[in-house]
Curated annotation (Swiss-Prot):
This is Electron transfer flavoprotein beta subunit lysine methyltransferase homolog. GO terms for molecular function: protein-lysine N-methyltransferase activity. Its EC number is 2.1.1.-. One of its GO terms (cellular component) is mitochondrial matrix. Transmembrane segments: none annotated. It comes from the Eukaryota. Pfam families: PrmA. Disulfide bonds: none annotated. Keywords: Methyltransferase, Transferase. It comes from Caenorhabditis elegans. Probable methyltransferase.
Amino acid sequence: MLKPSLNAAAKWMIRNTIVSNESLTPEINLHLITIASPLWMSTPDACPLPDPYWAFYWPGGQGLSRFILDNKPLFQGSEIVDFGAGCGSASISASICGAKKILANDIDRYALLSTKLNFHLNNLRDSKIQYSSINFLDDKNERMSTQFFTDSKNIRKFILLGDMFYDSDFAELLFSWLKKIQDAHMVRVLVGDPDRHPLAESEYLQRYKTKFTKNQLAEFSLPGYVIKEHYGFNTAKVFELKFQ
C-alpha cells in the first residue's frame, strides 16, 4: 500500500470521518469513523491509510478522558505523556484542564495527524503540545523517552495510556518501560481499559516479570451505542499502576 502524504491524508480524514461528540466526553469533538459513517461497513481497501485505529474512540480512552475532565485540579499545570495517543482524546482533555506541557506519542504518524486535527477541531492552541512518533519501547530510545519530564518535584507528571493492553507480550515490554520512567521521574501512570484480559485476569498479572499494584480510580458505564460499536464492553475503568 502506498502511503499518502500528510497533506493528502489530512484532507482524506476530514472528508471521510464524521465530527462526533457522542461519547463519555460530549465536551470534545473528534473526527471519527462511527456506526453512522459510510466507512463503518467498508472493506479495508476503501481506506488509503493503514489500520485507521485513530479514527475510533475506544472505551478505555473514553473513560480515561472522562476521568481527566472530571479532575481538572489534578492535571492543571502538569506534564503529560499521552502514550499511544490515537485520536488524541487524552491529550485534548489534559489541555482543556490546563496541563503545562503535553507530549502526544504514537508510532503511527497518521495517528499524530489525527490528534493534531482534533486539537484544531476543539479550538485548542497546540503550542504547548509536542508530537513524537519515536518508539519509546526500543532500548536505543530510552534516554529520549525520559527527556520530556523536568526534574522538578513540584510539578505533577503523568503517563496516560488508553486501550493499550491487548496482548500480554506487549504488556510485558510496556510495564518494563513504565517502571523505568516512574522510578526516574516519580511519574504517575494512569490507564484507561475496559477490562481486557492482559490487565484484568490474575493468570496474566501473576506471570508478568515487572510487578505492580493496580488501583481502580473510576468506573464509567458506557452508552449503548458505544457498547455496540466496541464488542460489548459495558464499562470503562481507570487504574493507577504503581511499580515495585
